[in-house]
Amino acid sequence: MKRKTLTQYLVEQQRSANALGPEVRLLIEVVARACKAISHAVSKGALGGVLGSLESENVQGEVQKKLDVLSNEILLEANEWGGHLAAMASEEMETIHLIPNRYPKGEYLLLFDPLDGSSNIDVNVSIGTIFSVLHAPHRVAGAEEVCEQDFLQPGSQQVAAGYAVYGPQTMLVLTIGTGVVGFTLDREMGSWVLTHENMRVPEDTKEFAINMSNMRHWAPPVRRYIDECLAGTTGPLGKDYNMRWIASMVADVHRIMTRGGIFMYPWDAREPGKAGKLRLMYEANPMSMIIEQAGGAAIDGTRRILDIQPDKLHQRVSVILGSKNEVERVGRYHAEAAQAPA
């Protein structure tokens, strides 16, 4: 059986009625090459001198790992010269990264979390890269400078989204708005090979992923749902659930993409002024597009995540995504709680 590479898949999409633009095709290929370089650095671990933390913090106030910084640099350097982008934004940087004047500018914006789950680097747990592609405003074609406001588009306007997961195998999961496909890195040949066509998330599940140690801080609708999961066959849901929690969004979502489940990183009463912990633009939006394209659902509790209009680049949000029926159940519990008398 002849194997289909990422390049072949993208060329086929470009030639089809879906009319994937050539700039998007080339952009995705560049991002995929950068992910190969990151995968190589991750796999070397201590042998490559990339483990451990730096003394610096990122814009989120989190201590940066060496691989965080290296991965960010790899993505910036790989993408700034190709002529596909007008600008980039990274979870690791406070402001946007403009394309240097010495390079041509393109019609798209790239956002990424260069190394999601980096707290797991030193303990050798699966981590990954998440990315999102948006259209740049038309005025950019007239050589006008891109600004942060240009990135503040709802997730429904994403052109493409994907993630690479660095585990026992390195995989790239991608959507261009026509379903979800998965590619596995052939390390000997150095190519991405299509191994998962038409990836789908089952509508029902018996698995949930959440950090149970924070249960006392959750909103009542989330506690209600988890209590019902824990009640098993004798409870209102009528089935036994298993809990899975890797503390790496890429790894947790990838498991859901391959076998179903619900991932929850809800609002937390310890920081009531924050809508959530995960970043809307770098994590929630791309993952929500992937999940929805695979037949799942993604909400913040009350709203579809892809409908949220961002008001700042590093905006945070509560995230509940995965198997459609389970996500909708949690949404109903939030709606019922909002309608209940005080």
From Swiss-Prot:
Q: What does the record note about the cofactor?
A: Binds 2 magnesium ions per subunit.
The protein's required cofactor(s) are namely: Mg(2+)
Positions contributing to Mg(2+) 2 binding: 113, 116, 283
CDD domains per record: FBPase (cd00354)
Q: Which residues bind Mg(2+) 1?
A: 91, 113, 115
One GO CC annotation? cytosol
EC number(s) from the headed UniProt entry: 3.1.3.11
Positions with a binding annotation for substrate: 116-119, 211, 277
Chain coiled-coil ranges: none
Q: Which Pfam families match?
A: FBPase, FBPase_C
Q: Which reaction does it catalyse?
A: beta-D-fructose 1,6-bisphosphate + H2O = beta-D-fructose 6-phosphate + phosphate
Task: List membrane-spanning regions.
Answer: none
**Pathway(s) annotated for this protein in UniProt:** Carbohydrate biosynthesis; gluconeogenesis
Q: What is its main location?
A: cytoplasm
Keywords assigned: Carbohydrate metabolism, Cytoplasm, Hydrolase, Magnesium, Metal-binding
What is a GO molecular function of this protein?
magnesium ion binding
Q: Which HAMAP family match?
A: FBPase_class1
Describe its partners and assembly state. Answer: Homotetramer.
Per the record, the similarity remark reads: Belongs to the FBPase class 1 family.
What is this protein's record name? Answer: Fructose-1,6-bisphosphatase class 1
Question: In which organism is this protein found?
Answer: Bordetella petrii (strain ATCC BAA-461 / DSM 12804 / CCUG 43448)
